[in-house]
């Protein structure tokens, strides 16, 4: 009888040590896998940040806005007869956004008779949705006055449209302000209903927390880590099952030891 008691006691200690070793193994593997997964996620986030910075780098070749100045000078040529011929360049500068200044210098030519001829270059500036300043020499006053009148009209229309947009935004934002306290008042009566049933709120929180784990596992699967796809959930389930089995075995062994010690 003493031999049976000693064997049962030895068996009890063997079960206890075996269970402790198994739990330590599974806990260590679970911690290591979680640590590796966190490192991989941090590396993936760093890679995405570097890619976004590289994509947002500005190109030196393309300029969206700025100022451009073009100077065009006329060329003169003289012949043996004393006649001079002048060639005048034409400037056609287009800018997407910004300010443009084009200065054209007039050319003079003299003949043997003492007569001077001056020629002025022509500028054809076509800015698109920009403010253009072209101080070219005044050829005719009517064209310049018409041009400034057109620009003033367009500026007036732009200011009127901006004022209308501001008025529309103010009218749209006005009635929205009093709606917020109504929603707050509507949400306040629902609070005491959840206080009455504590279990309902607990179940609701568990339901909300459950899909987050599934989303993490799905992200890992989509990233291409097939080895660790769903590793966290499987380890949790395995560790919980093994812990429950170990506790059951320990309880059985303890009852056996006590029964042998008391009744025998």
Swiss-Prot record:
<keyword id="KW-0336">GPI-anchor</keyword>
<feature type="signal peptide">
    <location>
        <begin position="1"/>
        <end position="20"/>
    </location>
</feature>
<keyword id="KW-0677">Repeat</keyword>
<keyword id="KW-0461">Malaria</keyword>
<protein>
    <recommendedName>
        <fullName>Merozoite surface protein 2</fullName>
    </recommendedName>
</protein>
<dbReference type="GO" id="GO:0005886">
    <property type="term" value="C:plasma membrane"/>
</dbReference>
<feature type="repeat" description="1">
    <location>
        <begin position="60"/>
        <end position="91"/>
    </location>
</feature>
<keyword id="KW-0477">Merozoite</keyword>
<feature type="glycosylation site" description="N-linked (GlcNAc...) asparagine">
    <location>
        <position position="36"/>
    </location>
</feature>
<feature type="glycosylation site" description="N-linked (GlcNAc...) asparagine">
    <location>
        <position position="238"/>
    </location>
</feature>
<keyword id="KW-0732">Signal</keyword>
<feature type="compositionally biased region" description="Basic and acidic residues">
    <location>
        <begin position="154"/>
        <end position="166"/>
    </location>
</feature>
<feature type="region of interest" description="Disordered">
    <location>
        <begin position="46"/>
        <end position="227"/>
    </location>
</feature>
<feature type="repeat" description="2">
    <location>
        <begin position="92"/>
        <end position="123"/>
    </location>
</feature>
<feature type="disulfide bond">
    <location>
        <begin position="221"/>
        <end position="229"/>
    </location>
</feature>
<feature type="region of interest" description="2 X 32 AA perfects repeats">
    <location>
        <begin position="60"/>
        <end position="123"/>
    </location>
</feature>
<feature type="region of interest" description="Polymorphic region">
    <location>
        <begin position="44"/>
        <end position="190"/>
    </location>
</feature>
<comment type="function">
    <text>May play a role in the merozoite attachment to the erythrocyte.</text>
</comment>
<dbReference type="Pfam" id="PF00985">
    <property type="entry name" value="MSA_2"/>
</dbReference>
<feature type="propeptide" description="Removed in mature form">
    <location>
        <begin position="239"/>
        <end position="264"/>
    </location>
</feature>
<keyword id="KW-0472">Membrane</keyword>
<feature type="lipid moiety-binding region" description="GPI-anchor amidated asparagine">
    <location>
        <position position="238"/>
    </location>
</feature>
<feature type="glycosylation site" description="N-linked (GlcNAc...) asparagine">
    <location>
        <position position="213"/>
    </location>
</feature>
<feature type="glycosylation site" description="N-linked (GlcNAc...) asparagine">
    <location>
        <position position="22"/>
    </location>
</feature>
<keyword id="KW-1015">Disulfide bond</keyword>
<feature type="compositionally biased region" description="Polar residues">
    <location>
        <begin position="82"/>
        <end position="101"/>
    </location>
</feature>
<dbReference type="InterPro" id="IPR001136">
    <property type="entry name" value="MSA2"/>
</dbReference>
<keyword id="KW-0325">Glycoprotein</keyword>
<dbReference type="GO" id="GO:0007155">
    <property type="term" value="P:cell adhesion"/>
</dbReference>
<keyword id="KW-1003">Cell membrane</keyword>
<feature type="compositionally biased region" description="Low complexity">
    <location>
        <begin position="102"/>
        <end position="145"/>
    </location>
</feature>
<dbReference type="GO" id="GO:0098552">
    <property type="term" value="C:side of membrane"/>
</dbReference>
<feature type="compositionally biased region" description="Basic and acidic residues">
    <location>
        <begin position="217"/>
        <end position="226"/>
    </location>
</feature>
<keyword id="KW-0449">Lipoprotein</keyword>
<feature type="compositionally biased region" description="Low complexity">
    <location>
        <begin position="70"/>
        <end position="81"/>
    </location>
</feature>
């Amino acid at each position: 009888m003493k031999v049976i008691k000693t064997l049962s006691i030895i068996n009890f200690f063997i079960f206890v040590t075996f269970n402790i070793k198994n739990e330590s193994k599974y806990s260590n593997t679970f911690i290591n896998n979680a640590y590796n997964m966190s490192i991989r996620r941090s590396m993936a986030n760093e890679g995405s940040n570097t890619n976004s910075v590289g994509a947002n780098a500005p190109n030196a070749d393309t300029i969206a806005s700025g100022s451009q100045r073009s100077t065009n000078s006329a060329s003169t040529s003289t012949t043996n007869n004393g006649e001079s011929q002048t060639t005048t360049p034409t400037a056609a500068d287009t800018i997407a956004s910004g300010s443009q200044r084009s200065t054209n210098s007039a050319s003079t030519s003299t003949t043997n008779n003492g007569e001077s001829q001056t020629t002025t270059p022509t500028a054809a500036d076509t800015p698109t949705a920009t403010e253009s300043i072209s101080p070219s020499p005044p050829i005719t006053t009517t064209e310049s006055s018409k041009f400034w009148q057109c620009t003033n009209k367009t500026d007036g229309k732009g200011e009127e449209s901006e004022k209308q947009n501001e008025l529309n935004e103010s009218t749209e934002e006005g009635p929205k302000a009093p709606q917020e306290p109504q929603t707050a008042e509507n949400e306040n009566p629902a609070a005491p209903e959840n206080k009455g049933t504590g279990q309902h709120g607990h179940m609701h929180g568990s339901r909300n927390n459950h899909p987050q784990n599934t989303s993490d596992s799905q992200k890992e699967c989509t990233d291409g880590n097939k080895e660790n796809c769903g590793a966290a959930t499987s380890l949790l389930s395995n560790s919980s099952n093994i812990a429950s089995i170990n506790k059951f075995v320990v309880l059985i062994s303890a009852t056996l030891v006590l029964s042998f010690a008391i009744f025998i």
